[in-house]
């Protein structure tokens, strides 16, 4: 059991951290203050102290015009920590802190993966040069930012000639009360992604108190054997006598850490509001406690999206990989991709998911086109649109890397073969980006006909994968499907290969279904029969068209007969009421939650576009609706606004997450822009003016930016004053813009009192403007005590409150 320290910001605030002063500059200008804080933690039980470098990456230091001093500040911080250790506890170790940049990566934001990687790489190199024992990437709310920071840390460690025995890399996420990060990632998904990429220790810090975090630690422990770290807040902050107070006393916090230790954490400490006294209490409690023995987790083959994890294998129900996002043999799709349109790609994705696809295969191989930008665009679009994990289907190493880099999850690579060029290009990418890898038994153009030869070649590919550091649970096998036209024995050999794979390796198996019938008549019938036999022979994951009625029915029937459909519930749901005399087509079934594009009602089609994030398609629909004489206000109220209400409800119930909400909002904005282009006088579409700002002293604006974007995309004129804004500036902006509503936020507990000051300044100016407040550390109670009119817990709540308020002004 290792005890980390507590909050640095809380302690700096106690010794007089001034608003507008960079906390990390203490390492250079007032090192004795930082050393004294470290000393207090060491004297109160800390085995590991964390450097005062939470905001010391270049992108954060830009806020203080200190971006050219990254190396100096970080090395100074490590030096101060080491001096404290040498004097007060020589056995202790140093963790180099790297906090969030405050930016979202594309497509949620405008930062590229490489730019975020570069800023973390610079900081990690400085911390390692200084001599840290750990890199601790903490308080991260977006898995893409964590992936960039983790890769940067791994690369910096390797470049310095260090190993994990020298410098361990810790990944700590922050989760909201709903058990997910702000961008929708649950603990088990976050853990799976970073473990596959090479994290050494995984856990949670900030955002919640011990009692709320305990079940989240249990979820992490359910999917990994890696060490777990937990550093909760001292409860959620409260406003008492205009001072920010964390409710958990030191005496209360220690015992509350016992369930966290029993859940699996072996590294514990504190975050916001915790002091040396809290750490002493935690140390006393956990070191006197004998933790429960942690269950060993057998590794499983899993892939994820940003929000969803699925397991593949012989011990779980077979899954479908949808094959439709592939321009091969699809002239219309190929031409649309040449034209830069992804409308059909997105509709294919939605239709396949609705029809039962568990994974979506993504192939951007258009003849004469560079796959790399097409693949990047596809990954951006699909990762925002659907929860379904993706399979990256390309032979182009550049396209493969850009897809893996920008995919916010653990993808499946389709595929690697036995050729040296394929192995040396693909396997390092799978290892680097934590992807699962499909192995195809082909080498030098040779297509082994016999099952035994395929198995032998597959074994050689598997052994090469082990040499690159991949593990058995990272690998899947393709039995190789040759068309019946190539020989009457081809189907039998594929089925034999499946059986041998299961017997020898036990890995999940994946194969393209439609290859078997190429060049044959009655293809759907042959495909369905072959699928049934393949599933019975050990196929776990067919690549198929789930919209094809015959293939889908064969799949559901087979899984029912093989015992994967308890009570035949899925079969009855799909086919129990079917008229056996009819010959159904290949259309995707329309479920009750599926917005339809086929309605004769133009407003219904517009609503469907918003709900499904069809920001390209909605332009033509709005143009047609206007041409047909539909009033712009009806388009806005009965089309766009109603759709966003549905999106908001789904967000509130956990059916949609921030990426999907942002995409829907962008679609709505595209519609507004189209209306205004065609009817410039449509000023009545502007709902009102809202001033937004982050309060004085707070340099964090990520949450404010989300709220501003959602409000703007919902038809409001936004006056964004930025971050660290003086109350007087906010007051003047309200006057200048005649704003009826102002939104102010604070992320830092140290700047929460500025919410009170800003509201007081607005009231003193005699303004009747309604004040809406929010932020990670703000609660309803805090908002009430501060005198706010509205508390918005998130961006959707802000939009709903704004809609309700402006409706009262009409």
Placement of each model-derived feature along the sequence:
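Domain-level signal for soluble alpha/beta catalytic cores
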Residues: 1-476, 482-810
């Amino acid at each position: 059991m290792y005890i980390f320290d507590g909050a640095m910001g809380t302690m700096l605030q106690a010794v007089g951290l001034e608003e507008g002063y960079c906390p990390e500059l203490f390492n250079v200008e007032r090192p004795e203050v930082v050393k004294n804080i470290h000393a207090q933690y060491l004297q109160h039980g800390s085995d590991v102290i964390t450097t005062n470098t939470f905001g010391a990456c270049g992108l954060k230091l830009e806020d203080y015009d200190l971006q050219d001093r990254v190396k100096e500040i970080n090395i100074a911080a490590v030096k101060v920590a080491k001096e404290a250790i040498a004097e007060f506890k020589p056995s202790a170790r140093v963790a180099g802190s790297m906090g969030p940049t405050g930016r979202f990566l594309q497509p949620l934001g405008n930062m590229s993966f490489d730019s975020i990687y570069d800023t973390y790489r610079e900081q990690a190199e400085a911390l390692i040069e200084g001599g840290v024992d750990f890199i601790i990437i903490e308080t991260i709310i977006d898995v893409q930012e964590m992936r960039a920071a983790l890769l940067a840390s791994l690369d910096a460690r390797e470049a310095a000639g260090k190993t994990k025995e020298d410098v361990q890399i810790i990944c700590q996420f922050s989760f909201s009360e709903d058990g997910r990060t702000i961008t929708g990632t649950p603990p088990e998904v976050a853990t799976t992604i970073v473990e596959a990429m090479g994290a050494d220790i995984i856990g949670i810090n900030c955002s919640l108190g011990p009692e709320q975090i305990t079940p989240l630690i249990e979820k992490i422990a359910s999917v990994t054997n890696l060490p777990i770290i937990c550093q909760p807040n001292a409860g959620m902050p409260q406003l008492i006598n205009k001072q920010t107070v964390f409710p958990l006393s030191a005496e209360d916090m220690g015992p509350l850490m016992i369930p966290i230790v029993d859940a699996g954490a072996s590294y514990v400490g504190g975050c916001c509001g915790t002091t040396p006294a809290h750490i002493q209490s935690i140390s006393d409690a956990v070191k006197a406690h004998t933790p429960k023995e942690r269950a060993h987790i057998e590794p499983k083959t899993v892939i994820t999206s940003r929000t969803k994890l699925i397991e593949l294998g012989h011990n779980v129900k077979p899954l479908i990989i949808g094959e439709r996002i592939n321009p091969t043999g699809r002239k219309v799709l190929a031409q649309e991709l040449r034209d830069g349109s992804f409308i059909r790609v997105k509709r294919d994705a939605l239709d396949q998911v609705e029809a039962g696809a568990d994974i979506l295969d993504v192939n951007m191989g258009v003849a004469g086109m560079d796959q790399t930008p097409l693949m990047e665009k596809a990954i951006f679009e699909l990762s925002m649109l659907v929860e379904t994990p993706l399979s990256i289907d390309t032979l182009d190493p550049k396209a493969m890397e850009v897809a893996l880099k920008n995919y916010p999850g653990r993808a499946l690579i389709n595929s690697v073969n036995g050729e040296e060029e394929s192995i040396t290009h693909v396997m390092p990418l799978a290892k680097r980006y934590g992807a699962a890898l499909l192995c195809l038994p082909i080498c030098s153009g040779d297509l082994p006909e016999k099952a035994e030869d395929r198995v032998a070649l597959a074994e050689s590919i598997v052994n090469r994968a082990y040499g690159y550091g991949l593990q058995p649970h990272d690998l899947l096998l393709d039995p190789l499907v040759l068309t019946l036209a190539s020989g009457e024995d081809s189907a039998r050999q594929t089925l034999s290969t499946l059986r041998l794979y299961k017997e020898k390796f036990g890995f999940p198996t994946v194969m393209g279904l439609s290859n078997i019938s190429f060049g044959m008549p009655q293809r759907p019938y042959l495909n369905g029969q072959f699928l049934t036999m393949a599933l019975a022979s050990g196929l776990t994951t067919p690549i198929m068209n789930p919209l094809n009625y015959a293939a889908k029915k064969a799949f559901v029937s087979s899984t029912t007969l093989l015992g994967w459909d308890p009570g035949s519930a899925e079969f009855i749901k799909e086919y129990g009421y079917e008229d056996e005399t009819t010959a159904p087509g290949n259309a995707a079934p329309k479920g009750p939650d599926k917005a339809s594009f086929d309605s004769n009602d133009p407003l219904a089609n517009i609503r469907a576009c918003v709900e499904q994030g069809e920001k390209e398609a909605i332009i033509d629909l709005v143009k047609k609706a206007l041409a047909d004489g539909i009033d712009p206000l009806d388009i806005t109220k009965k089309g766009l606004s109603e759709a966003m209400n549905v999106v908001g409800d789904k967000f509130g119930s956990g059916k949609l997450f921030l990426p999907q909400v942002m995409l829907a909002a962008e679609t709505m904005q595209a519609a507004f822009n189209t209306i205004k282009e065609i009817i410039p006088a449509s000023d009545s579409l502007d709902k009102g003016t809202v001033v937004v700002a982050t309060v004085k002293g707070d340099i964090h604006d990520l949450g404010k930016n989300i709220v501003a974007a959602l409000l703007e995309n919902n038809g409001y004129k936004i006056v964004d004053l930025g971050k660290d804004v003086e109350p007087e500036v906010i007051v003047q902006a309200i006057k200048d813009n005649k704003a009826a509503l102002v939104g102010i936020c604070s992320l830092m507990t140290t700047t929460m009192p500025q919410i009170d000051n800003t509201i007081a300044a607005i009231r003193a100016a005699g303004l009747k403007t309604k004040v809406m407040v929010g932020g990670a550390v703000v609660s309803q109670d805090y908002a009430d005590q501060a005198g706010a009119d509205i508390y918005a817990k998130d961006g959707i709540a802000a939009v709903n409150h704004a809609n309700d308020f402006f409706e009262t002004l009409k």
